[in-house]
Amino acid sequence: MDPQNQHGSGSSLVVIQQPSLDSRQRLDYEREIQPTAILSLDQIKAIRGSNEYTEGPSVVKRPAPRTAPRQEKHERTHEIIPINVNNNYEHRHTSHLGHAVLPSNARGPILSRSTSTGSAASSGSNSSASSEQGLLGRSPPTRPVPGHRSERAIRTQPKQLIVDDLKGSLKEDLTQHKFICEQCGKCKCGECTAPRTLPSCLACNRQCLCSAESMVEYGTCMCLVKGIFYHCSNDDEGDSYSDNPCSCSQSHCCSRYLCMGAMSLFLPCLLCYPPAKGCLKLCRRCYDWIHRPGCRCKNSNTVYCKLESCPSRGQGKPS
């Protein structure tokens, strides 16, 4: 019986033909092997041609691991062969994009893609790409730089350290001035009866002592005599006659005076040292007499003042 008479004049038959297994394996092998590009010497460029120096220790920023680009594989589709029964001829049409164009009157099943063909190759490539990403992503932890301190916000301003003068006047405590001399009416505590010295200060960035004693020694060249006696003495403990060259109680008194007499021929300013030393002692006594607030009596009775309104600085005798 004629097939045209059975199915009618407007019917069509679609036959789906799949490629053989040998052709699939051969095509998969050809797609996996990609030709590698060979670069010439002119195309090769130096990545880092210069050194980069930094002022301090720094951590090199490592580039982020690049993910391996996934290779898009064009999967094969089934070969759709439409057969027109009316005209008795075969029209084969292969679609590479997964869509088959059929005549308007023919309605046949269309298979878009076949995922079973490249399953083995895609699973192998995915596993290799994931392993490479895992190795690149595991970077060693950065070690802290020794001596590096973490930055902290300063909340308190630095304060200037104020050093009080050792010979400065101390604050008077009214509770200490309770022992009053019965004869002169002045305080007999240790602070008030201590002798007052001439004022002095530090000059030249706190390196030189400026006082009346140093002015007398440098003005009369006595500092030079002390330096010579210091280098000639054998006493290493520091208690030598170089500190007091004019002292009569220490050893080598005659030799010291003879040496200073010989040096006065070349340094006549040494002859001014005895009168300058006498003037210095007189100035000390005058300054102490004026500025000492305590009692100077040698033999006197002491009265303890219990009243808060009693005079503590010799304003009057206590009753």
UniProtKB/Swiss-Prot annotation:
Residues 112-131 have a biased composition (Low complexity). One of its GO terms (cellular component) is Golgi apparatus. It is found in: Cytoplasm; Membrane. This is Protein sprouty homolog 1. Forms heterodimers with SPRY2. Interacts with TESK1. Interacts with CAV1 (via C-terminus). Residues 183-295 form the SPR domain. The modification N-acetylmethionine is found at M1. PROSITE patterns: SPR. Residues 69-78 have a biased composition (Basic and acidic residues). Signal peptide: none annotated. Residues 54-78, 100-160 are annotated as: Disordered. The gene is SPRY1.
